[in-house]
Amino acid sequence: MEGDWEQLGLTLLNTDDDNNIVLFSSTDELSDFRNRLDAYEGPTPAGQKNPSYSGFINRIGSISTLEPRDRLGIRIKEAGFTEVSDLQDGQEYILDVELWEFGTQAARRRKAEEIIAFIEEQGGELYDHYSGPSITMIRVKASGQSIRPIFSVPEVAFIDLPPEPDIEANQIVQFALDDVPPVAPLDPDLPIIAVLDTGVNDHPFLADAIVAREAFPSELGEADIAGHGTAVAGVAALGDLRSQLDGTSLQRVARIISAKVVTDERKFFDRRTLPSQMRQTIQSLNASHGCRIFVISLGDTKANFEQGRVGPWATTLDELARELNVLIFVSAGNRPPRGGTSVEQGVTQYPGYLRGGRRNSDQLLRWIV
């Protein structure tokens, strides 16, 4: 049916599991579409059993325009906002404004700049403007009265609170150095893996394997206060440590770049959109260190509820993987009840988690490069 919409000058923007679709028209008049409706409602042509275009029109349940409240994102709705009017005058909000993927990238950028100009005229502040191949998003700090009109802009897809990382570090297992095999000398030709996380602390197993410590942006610092990034770096550098404890030495399988992208308070940096932060980090490390393997063990608990679409974070990673010819590994399925802490779960449960009973399982698979 998408071909039918294209013939009418309509662009398919979004679908969901309830068979609702969002279309964008290049003209306000919708002349071609209205002509088909008029023909359908008119007399049945001679020699035909059914009205004109009945095969097309009968598949449509109802037609309506998007309302401002339809643009409320999942996070802001879960925060208790059910109507645009819930955004209060005099109250400031930090919000992500995402545009539909309409027209050209330049056209989307111009529309974003118009929205930015309006918000700034109302006393709001621009935090970030990301204009990528598919995703166009701005992050603003604005009052209720200055952001409410943006919910009525047709080109706006969603307005939402910024995402938050789902970080849970496992309990630390302590070993005395005398109780584990010695660390084997590091092979200088080992591949480099960039760990985009909470930072990486000093550790005797990792000390000579750390190629660089960087933060994006730099004001995040380098220390791993949460402890999550250090654990992820250990897995990247050593694999399954348990399998090596009975050996004669600990073998590293990779060198590590620590790329800190999370604050010490376990939040994403509030002055950057996630697409902007991911693109800056991955492009920079690829250019400066030739890094082609990236690990992102940071979840977004709301990503499963992106309303029938691939979200901006996943889309940006897909684009970067293609543009730079890099591998990006993203954790999935390692939350209760599937903890992913045993090898058996990877065989017996994880494949079903990806494939079984989910109409949007292809979206999950897009995260695995």
Question: What is the predicted role of each segment?
Answer:
Residues 182-214, 220-273, 323-325, 338:
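Subtilisin-like serine protease catalytic core
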Residues 130-143:
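Aromatic/histidine-rich interaction motifs
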Residues 90-92, 96-102, 196-198, 258-264, ...:
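Short loop/turn segments at strand-loop or loop-helix junctions that form parts
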Residues 34, 204-210, 218, 304-309, ...:
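A short acidic (Asp/Glu
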Residues 110, 114, 145, 263-368:
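Substrate-binding/access-modulating region of protease and related hydrolase catalytic domains
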